[in-house]
Amino acid sequence: MPKLQLSELLSLTKVEQTLRLAEVNVELEKLTAQERVVWALENLEGNPALSSSFGIQAAVMLQLVTEIKSDTPIILTDTGYLFPETYQFIDQLTDRLNLNLHVFTADESPNWQEARYGKLWEQGVEGIEKYNKLNKVQPMRRALDQLEVGIWFSGLRREQSGSRANLPILSIQNGVFKFLPVLDWTNKEVHYFLKEYDLPYHPLWDQGYLSVGDTHTTQKWEPGMSEEETRFFGLKRECGLHEDDGELGGSGI
């Protein structure tokens, strides 16, 4: 597979860009997750970074990427509303894996946001989307800019939701390469990887949580619920980080 220049790809039309990336994705599907990370670091233009919410299975990507490049910046967008167990999990994994952690937050504090806008997460889809833009999307863009990121690693998996079922391993989102090494992994493969490296699930896993975000928009799993229904009251699956709005040159996939 050829080396890819971001500037060259961004000069193409959406259709040309998508076709070019599709050719590479066919080959990436044949590689292991570890081989994909190595390929990305050797063949994609720009500085790497890994975004992590330190959710249920976060240790997988943190181990996978830092084992190959130990000083990779780890980006956390902290809303201020994470579970206490999440903050403890962040400290645990940062110490265990010697992570190069970078924390980014919204320009307005949680209390200031509530004073100005009320509890956005109680204001339907529109309120949730505004909340996510303020607390997740804008801080993430600032992180990508300040760290001069060209390769954005993420741990999204197709099995997690319908909105992720057709994602490619490699795309362009918000002007950078988006790379998903474990996209095709199953829950069983995740479990075996964590077991092999003696890595923990998030502490709330044992309390019945399948997915963990903010305290006010995360629900414990109950019989009959899908994983998607445990977040954002079932109104949304994505927090906005992984949705390309097209403003900064994305492949639209």
Curated annotation (Swiss-Prot):
Q: Which domain of life is it from?
A: Bacteria
Q: What is its EC number?
A: 1.8.4.8
Write the record's keywords in alphabetical order, separated by commas.
Answer: Cytoplasm, Oxidoreductase
**UniProt feature coiled coil, ranges:** none
Q: Which GO terms describe its cellular component?
A: cytoplasm
Pathway connected to this protein: Sulfur metabolism; hydrogen sulfide biosynthesis; sulfite from sulfate: step 3/3
InterPro entries in the record:
PAPS/APS_Rdtase, PAPS_reduct_dom, PAPS_reductase_CysH, Rossmann-like_a/b/a_fold
Give the chief site where it resides.
Answer: cytoplasm
Enzyme active site: 239 (nucleophile)
Alphabetized Gene3D superfamilies for the sequence: HUPs
Q: Where does it live in the cell?
A: Cytoplasm
Does the entry feature the keyword Oxidoreductase, yes or no?
yes
UniProt function note: Catalyzes the formation of sulfite from phosphoadenosine 5'-phosphosulfate (PAPS) using thioredoxin as an electron donor.
Q: Give the PANTHER family listed for this entry.
A: PHOSPHOADENOSINE PHOSPHOSULFATE REDUCTASE
Q: What is this protein called?
A: Phosphoadenosine 5'-phosphosulfate reductase
Origin organism is Aliivibrio fischeri (strain MJ11) (Vibrio fischeri)
* Gene expressing this chain: cysH
